[in-house]
From Swiss-Prot:
Assigned protein family: Belongs to the amino acid/polyamine transporter 2 family.
Region (Disordered) residue spans: 412-584, 606-658
Cellular compartments per GO CC: membrane
Record field: compositional bias (Basic and acidic residues): 412-453, 460-479, 503-546, 627-658
Keywords for the protein's UniProt record, in alphabetical order: Amino-acid transport, Ion transport, Membrane, Sodium, Sodium transport, Transmembrane, Transmembrane helix, Transport
UniProt protein name: Putative sodium-coupled neutral amino acid transporter 10
Superkingdom of source: Eukaryota
GO terms under biological process: amino acid transmembrane transport; sodium ion transport
Biological source species: Xenopus laevis (African clawed frog)
Polar residues bias (residue ranges): 564-573
Length: 1045
């Protein structure tokens, strides 16, 4: 063989080998190694015979073109069929070239310029390549020298590409033998899909006759040897690339094998080189396609039946055809994004016609013989029908694989082949190769985790747990308090903080199910607790509304900072109840218990003076109005769960009704912060209250010693008027200190149905210290006979500003208003007598004074010096805090007499005050009871009713008996400290044998049989005459300022 023939061989090899080489590993995977090799050899044999059919037919018919042979054999029909098939084959090949350029070039240039691989970028790249590279080369008329040099470069590149594939197989375990278990050897399902690709891979029939015409000595034998050698080289190349590429990626082979390779310098060079070889090879495909179009459309038949030579075309026609072919194939490359589809479809139709069917038909027509031609014709027709159908039905699968591969190349991931295989229905179980395991250890557990994250969970479970821990561990005003989120406010156990890292929390399915059940339980308890809170609020609102009509039985309670609501304890179990059992100051325990106030009275007192709630400068207001707006919202420092549960109900009751379960974490944190601010404020207020109580306690003990000494000096004075004046002085001396503790204490009593619905006189307690003295009167059943009231027993402890009380039978409000004027007149008449009686009760010397009053009635003015001295002191101390008295329900004009006497006291007119005391003294007002009773005025308590029954205050039995009854009244409050204080009180009183006159402990209960009228006359009116006493089984005062507003 001459040396010139190698140039022809290189041209034939370059014309055969094209983009089909990239699909060889894919064909081996579809058919298996053995079956794919056999089919490749079969296609090589058929390609060789088809080429020889054309050479032999050309030598016999003296024709040198493919179309001329078809016209010689079958006329115009054959000529048109051949030309159409040739045009389709060339266009399909150009489309495949564009697809390869888009696949390889888009990823490379995107990384080079830092862009993202997208469809728009791919379109832009194809348009740029066709406009800048393909079109200039295709417009040249004489390209034979360029084509030969390009063929040499292409063959060198294909050789390098083959060695890269072989080395890649070494890297992926070729010698380890692992691939033997994963590759397929015979797979019949992919036969009809691979045969068209194989047939297209040997499509060199268009180059046969030009090569035969270019020989110096044309002969069939030389052409046979040249094509045999060329096809053997191509077959070897195809088998090498297919086998080693399949071994490298046995489970995940794309139509373009270069897509499977990881991104590195070598593979990028291979991709760019292959892309450039394809781009430069366009003119080799466009040249025959353009000539075929010219002869098909513009060639004219001559008179002798032949056609004019189609070698020359006018410039305009040449340019138009070139533009149509270039940009038409570019549009096809954009619409068909995968190379194996276009190659399979083109090979099954045009390839089978050009390579197999037409040569066999021409040879059979001209030579009239040939068994081989019939076999090749049958195979060609079979491929045309079956392979076309098979290629069209499986078009979508490679498209999905290729699009995913492009995304993986974008992200520079080497683990994408495993994800591609998951979309193939006919593949075996996925097995990872050793080289790919480094970057994929975490892929398998991600899918089950994502399936478990469902429902209201907004983010990963781990992230949510960390947010919950942050919520629980927020800063708090007190270390013992735990701020719980709204969603967990109803838990019946304190939340357990978890700082450790949760291990295997997501892997254990059982734990996840338990968590779901616990969430359902918490939601159910939330709904139940909301209903309980609503049920608790309704009776409290009703009790507050009916507070002016009937006063319920009082239950002894602790001060506001120690309020213990059993209903709230059922909902929340406070983790650290520090203030529940012991008060902050142990020695103040007895005083705090003496200040016990019923819940209803405390509420009304707070409503009456809500404007002064924040005035902590005045200790009296600070104790009267603790910084608690409502008992339902009252927070205990040791009970954070209660805080977080009640505050949202008070503020966002309607909002939480439908959204309590859908609050996001940001809202929970905001609610917790607001609760913490409120809790800090409450704690600061309570600290101030405790400081005030401590100061008052110290002042009381200091004052107690001074009063004891003063009582000893004046103990021998038997004059009743002296004692009364001295009592008045004490009433004026101790208001400033006494109010602070005693103005909070209310009269603990219960009205069955008051005779008159009292027009309650609301007094700002710090304004009139004389009215703030407390006397608790426990009046048992008071029965009314026809003409007198029986008072079998009156337990006098402390009375808060005695006020006229009504009858104890049920009467309507209209009847009460009718007799109101009589009550006012009685109040003005008995003003001074009640003033003296209250002063005596406050100093706890009631019994001693009454005894001396009964035995030694002396003229009121016997010691003017002492009287003046004490009167000045009293008026001086009471004057600074005197303010106008607010009266509810009674007009100010009706109390004119009472106000005149109050003004006399406030202005400090000593002489007038003394004169009033002297003139209004009435020692025996026995008829007062009948006068008030006949006038239907409220029955009043008279201190003189105790004259006979207080003559024996030293009797220990009476003390013990009354003390025992008092303890029975306190059974509702399970407080051991209170019982201990009461027992100590009884022992101290027995030891002193009743000699102690001034004491801060309650005076023993004293029995009274009669002298009811005297008792009512003495206590009928007070200094201001503004407050009223409701007489029933027990005495209780209700202050409600809301009615005045």
């Amino acid at each position: 063989m001459a040396a010139s023939n190698w140039g022809l061989i290189m041209n034939i090899v370059n014309s055969i080998v094209g983009v089909s080489v990239l699909t060889m590993p894919f064909c081996f995977q579809q058919c298996g190694i053995l079956l794919g090799t056999l089919l490749l050899m079969l296609c090589t044999w058929m390609a060789h015979h088809s080429c020889m059919f054309l050479v032999k037919s050309a030598s016999v018919s003296k024709r040198r073109t493919y179309a001329g042979l078809a016209f010689h054999a079958y006329g115009k029909v054959g000529k048109m069929m051949v030309e159409t098939s040739m045009i389709g084959l060339m266009l399909g090949t150009c489309i495949a070239f564009y697809v390869v350029i888009g696949d390889l070039g888009s990823s490379f240039f995107a990384r080079l310029f830092g862009l993202e691989v997208s469809e728009g970028f791919r379109v832009f790249l194809l348009f740029s390549v066709s406009l800048c590279i393909v079109l200039p080369l295709s417009l040249q008329r004489n390209m034979m020298a360029f084509i030969q040099s390009f063929s040499a470069m292409a063959l060198m590149f294909y050789t390098v590409f083959m060695f890269v594939i072989v080395l890649s197989s070494f890297k992926h375990g070729l010698f380890s033998g692992q691939w033997l278990k994963h590759v397929s050897y015979i797979r019949w399902e992919g036969v009809f899909r691979c045969i068209p690709i194989y047939g297209m891979s040997f499509a060199c029939q268009s180059q046969v006759l030009p090569t035969y015409d270019s020989l110096d000595d044309p002969s069939v034998k030389i052409m046979s040897s040249i094509f045999a050698l060329s096809l053997n080289v191509v077959t070897t190349f195809y088998i090498t690339v297919g086998f080693f590429g399949y071994v490298s990626f046995p489970e995940t082979i794309a139509g373009n094998v270069l897509v499977n390779f990881p991104s590195n310098l070598v593979t990028e060079m291979i991709r760019v080189g292959f892309m450039m070889s394809v781009a430069v090879g366009f003119p080799m495909m466009i040249l025959p396609c353009r000539q075929a179009l010219n002869t098909l459309l513009f060639e004219q038949q001559q008179k002798d039946g032949t056609f004019t030579a189609g070698g020359y075309m006018p410039p305009l026609r040449f340019k138009i055809l070139t533009l149509v072919v270039v940009f038409g194939t570019m549009l096809g490359g954009i619409l068909i994004p995968n190379v194996e589809t276009i190659l399979g479809l083109t090979g099954a139709t045009m390839g089978s016609l050009i390579c197999l069917i037409c040569p066999a038909l021409i040879y059979k027509k001209i030579h009239k013989k040939g068994l081989a031609s019939q076999f090749i014709l049958g195979v060609g027709l079979l491929i045309l029908v079956i392979s076309t159908y098979t290629t069209l039905t499986v078009t979508e699968e490679p498209t999905q694989i290729k699009s995913e591969l492009l995304e993986r190349i974008d992200l520079k991931e080497e683990k994408d082949p495993e994800q591609i295989n998951s979309q193939k229905s006919d593949e075996k179980a996925k097995v990872e190769q050793p080289g790919d395991n480094r970057d994929k250890p975490k892929l398998p557990p991600k899918n089950p985790e994502e399936e478990q994250i469902k429902g209201p969970i907004e983010g990963p479970q781990k992230e949510k747990d960390t947010k919950k821990q942050e919520e629980v561990q927020l800063d708090r005003p007190d270390q013992g308090d735990i701020a719980v989120p709204v969603g967990e406010a109803h838990r019946h156990e304190p939340p357990i903080p978890q700082d450790e890292v949760a291990v295997d929390e997501k892997k254990d399915q059982g734990e996840r199910e338990e968590k779901k059940e616990s969430v359902v339980d918490i939601n159910s308890t939330e709904k139940k607790d909301k209903q309980q809170i609503n049920l608790e609020k309704e009776p409290e609102i009703k009790d507050q509304a009916e507070a002016n009509k009937g006063i319920n039985e009082p239950v002894p309670q602790k001060p506001p900072q120690e309020v213990n609501d059993p209903n709230k304890q059922q909902l929340v179990n406070p983790p650290t109840p520090r203030l529940k059992e012991q008060p902050p100051f142990k020695d103040l325990e007895g005083i705090i218990k003496d200040l016990a106030v019923p819940v209803e009275i405390k509420k009304n007192a707070e409503i009456a003076e809500e404007k002064d709630n924040n005035d902590f400068a005045n200790p009296v207001k600070a104790i009267e109005n603790p910084p608690i707006k409502d008992e339902k919202n009252e927070q205990i420092p040791g009970d954070p769960g209660k805080e977080s549960h009640v505050e949202p109900k008070a503020e966002d009751n309607q909002a939480e009704a439908g959204k309590a379960e859908l609050l996001d974490h940001a809202f929970l944190l905001q609610v917790i912060k607001e609760q913490q601010v409120q809790q800090k404020r409450l704690l600061d207020q309570q600290e101030k209250l405790l400081e005030v109580i401590k100061e008052q306690h110290m002042e009381i003990h200091q004052q107690k010693g001074d009063e004891d000494q003063q009582d000893k000096l004046e103990g021998n004075i038997a004059d009743k008027n002296k004692e009364e004046l001295k009592a008045e002085a004490r009433v004026a001396q101790k208001p400033l200190e006494g109010d602070k503790l005693e103005n909070v204490g209310e009269v603990n009593a219960k009205v069955d149905k008051p005779a008159v619905e009292e027009h309650v006189v609301v007094v700002e307690k710090e304004q009139n210290p004389a009215l703030n003295q407390v006397v608790k009167g426990n009046v048992p059943d008071v029965k009314k006979n026809d003409h007198k009231i029986e008072a079998p027993k009156i337990n006098v402890e402390e009375v808060k500003v005695p006020i006229s009380a009504g009858k104890h039978k049920k009467q309507s409000v209209q009847e009460n208003l009718i007799h109101q004027q009589d009550v006012d007149q009685g109040a003005s008449d008995n003003y001074k007598q009640r003033e003296k009686a209250v002063a005596a009760n406050k100093d706890y010397v009631l019994g001693h004074i009454i005894q001396q009053e009964t035995a030694n009635p002396i003229d009121p003015i016997t010691l003017p010096d002492l009287q003046d001295k004490l009167g000045k002191l009293a008026l001086h101390q009471t004057e600074p805090k005197q303010k106008p008295v607010k009266i509810a329900g009674i007009g100010e004009k009706k109390l004119g007499a009472v106000q005149e006497e109050k003004i006399l006291v406030q202005k400090g007119q000593e002489a007038q005050a003394d004169k009033v005391i002297q003139d209004n003294y009435n020692p025996v007002p026995d008829h007062g009871l009948h006068e008030n009773n006949n006038a239907d005025a409220p029955a009043t308590i008279n201190v003189e009713a105790k004259k006979e029954h207080i003559e024996k205050p030293k009797d220990g039995a009476v003390l013990e008996h009354d003390e025992g009854k008092q303890n029975r009244d306190l059974k509702l409050q399970n407080d051991m400290d209170l019982r201990r204080k009461k027992r100590d009180l009884a022992l101290v009183q027995q030891e002193n044998n009743g000699a102690q006159i001034i004491s801060f402990h309650p005076v023993p209960n004293l029995k009274v049989n009669d002298l009811r009228g005297a008792l009512e006359a003495r206590l009928n009116q007070m200094v201001d005459g503004g407050l009223q006493v409701v007489q029933s089984r027990k005495i209780k005062q209700l202050i409600d300022e809301e009615k005045n507003r």
